[in-house]
Amino acid sequence: MSDTNMLALAVETYQRLFPEIKQRIRKEPDLSPAKTQVVPIPRIDEILDMIQPLPPQTCLIGTCADGVPFLLNLTGMETGSLLVTGDPGCGKTHHLQVMAESTIHINSPHEVQIAVITRDPDEWASLLKKPGYSRHFSGVYGWFEQGATDLINQLVTLGESRGSGRHPGATVLLLVDDLPDIFEADYEIQNGLHWLLENGLFSGIRVAASMDARFCPTNPFWVDTFRTFLIGKIESDATAQSLGLDGVGSTKDLMPQVEFSAYTGENWSKYRLPVN
């Protein structure tokens, strides 16, 4: 297949599997066993190499059961901020790391910069140590570090400046690992992050965060800022239903660290995380 045809296939796949999402209310997810043969998930680089070249300003979300890539347009407005949720241990941090590493594979540091705020910066150390990766990161900070507050303030200032037509530059992918930790932060960082969740995309700042599903029903102030939900294993049907998304049925059969479900424009579809 020629490069042109491969690119056309990649774009068509993106449009079919992850169209812009216009609302949070969804239909019933299809969590039944795949009818097609499940293809073993390769590494991120192997998946992307199969369909090069990829459109810039994208990242990999996962792969379908047949191995077709599941892509996200980092600048797509209607998908809004992304919330990765599920039970503890379902793979939320791994999911954010897949987004980060695939962003590095697809985009240059001049196109996309990645910033991370997390409970445990050591979980991200291996990515930073890979050759050439550090150029893509503007910082990885623990919630307890002053750097986290400084980062949020800098991004809010950048967003406001870009809203006035100043300081164009790289798209920023802000990954917030374990969002509930912000509940203990001071007002300044909470207010700044909330602004970024609601307004960041208008200024080229894409936010994706993770939160245990059990905390979602009692924190609508934060959860309501997200438009796209990537849902991992939730053992309790009651917890899954309490997310308030129409059509979210049982997710207890999703494989921890491997499988998630997302709305794709017509229904909820299961996908798998690649190895990074």
Name these PLM-found stretches.
Residues 5-20, 38-234, 238, 251, ...:
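P-loop NTPase catalytic phosphate-binding loop
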Residues 22, 26-30, 34-37:
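All-alpha RGS (Regulator of G-protein Signaling) helical domain and cognate RGS-like helical scaffolds
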Residues 235-276:
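Conserved P-loop NTPase
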